[in-house]
Amino acid sequence: MQLNRFMIRPYVEQALRDEIGPGDTTGGFLVGEDPVQTAQIYAKGSGIVCGLLLADETIRTVDPDARIEHMVKDGEDMGPGKVLLKIEAKASTFFMIERCALDWIQQMSGIATKTRRYVNLVKHTKVRVTDTRKGWPGLRMLQKYAVRCGGAHNHIFSLSNCVLVKDNHIKIAGGIRNAVEILRSRAQHTFKFEVECETLEMVQEALDCGVEVIMFDNMDLDEIKAGLKLVNGRAIAEASGGVNERTIVPIAETGVDVISVGDLTHSVTSVDISLDVKDIKPSAIRTIERLRAATG
């Protein structure tokens, strides 16, 4: 998965509307001639870089003439003091973009960093770590991109990607078989079917329906192992529910194919990132004397 400016522009514009509103009532009054200044965005914490394109687009939206040099790429390691972006832009630009640009990098790097920890924990197994749909509504695409930068894979992007039969679908349909039969009669032939199973009996029923993916939902290790014996290679075996950094290793070592982890996106600690303006030009500062002279 890759991001491009066309995809991210609506997110950037909304963030700037939230941040600037009708105008910057602090920086706008302090800046004088508004000369070009230099600045750096750099890491104060350690982790995996993500969100640089959003920071870049944030700056260019406010100042189309800005010059930005990327010192690292999304998905690379960073540590304290590492410079991520070098920027040349009008002095007023930095007041307006600082919070948004930093927030994009901090939050997305937080997801990528946590994801990398999970991936490293189970790299001795064949399991594929994926995200879920849990997270901030409206930002799913960005969160899933950050997961990829951290080295994991994406689960479905939306309910239109596959047939995912969950507990409430089963209740409404009166059982797995009826749900699958109804959905097979209506869904595109290209769709895979995944069924969320809470018991071994549900696993067997789903297998009898010929579904392509079995999700072991909140099962303990013994249940997962028993479920894998039932599956026996006839479907992709996915474990999900309550997975954390303490439990993922024993789950992976059962031999499941996929572990979906809501924790990648629903509980994130951001990475500390900062912006530092360099060599402030005297003409950038509007003194009270200059203001009085300008206003008569």
Question: Residue ranges of each PLM-predicted region?
Answer:
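Short secondary-structure boundary segments
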Residues: 218, 241, 263-264
